[in-house]
A protein has these predicted regions:
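Class I SAM-dependent methyltransferase SAM-binding "motif I" and its flanking Rossmann-like core
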Residues: 131, 140-141
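Acidic, divalent-metal-coordinating active-site segment for phosphoryl/phosphodiester hydrolysis
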Residues: 103-110
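Domain-level signal for Mg2+-assisted phosphodiester chemistry and nucleotide/NA-binding surfaces
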Residues: 1-89, 110-113, 118, 126, ...
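Short beta-strand segments
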Residues: 98-100
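Short, well-ordered beta-strand core segments
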Residues: 96, 137-139
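Conserved alpha/beta core segments of nucleic-acid transaction machinery
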Residues: 144-145
């Protein structure tokens, strides 16, 4: 039986997930309970993220702007991590869903899980095992045929 949560936070690493997966993410996470926080993180001035606007508006997802402070260094992961911790301390959620295929979210996932929060990871096949294993539930995207 799938657990249902009253306050679920959905944090999306938009720089690390394909836009065509967004609707599927919303459907899959909604099955776990009521999503009260929906945020997508990225540098929205990048050409690769220009097409996200309509989908974010359609699903009511807040776009969190994060510029890269140094060339070739992604600051988005740090912004998402800070928000995950900030929301934890505000008691804003009882389950956290992180959408990314990046292992950089392993430490924050460990931390929030140690504080009694149910952690759901959503990513692609390439997601490192460390992140998959720390999640209470990891949802794998299906490859398009």
């Amino acid at each position: 039986m799938m657990e249902k949560f009253q306050k679920l936070a959905l944090l999306i690493d938009a720089e690390n997930i394909a836009l065509d997966k967004l609707e599927s993410v919303i459907q899959k996470i909604s099955a776990y309970g009521r999503i009260v926080i929906q945020r997508a993180y990225g540098d929205w001035s990048k050409e690769s993220l220009k097409n996200w606007k309509d989908s974010l508006n359609r699903f009511g997802i807040k776009a969190q702007q994060q510029f890269n402070y140094t060339p070739k260094k992604n600051s988005t992961d740090m912004a998402l991590t800070i928000d995950a911790l900030d929301l934890l301390y505000q008691s804003s959620y009882d389950a956290l869903a992180i959408v990314s295929s990046d292992c950089d979210f392993t430490p924050v996932s460990i931390y929030v899980r140690e504080h009694g929060i149910y952690v759901i990871g959503i990513g692609e096949k390439k997601t490192p095992e460390a992140f998959k294993k720390i999640c209470n539930k990891f949802i794998l995207f299906k490859d398009k045929k």
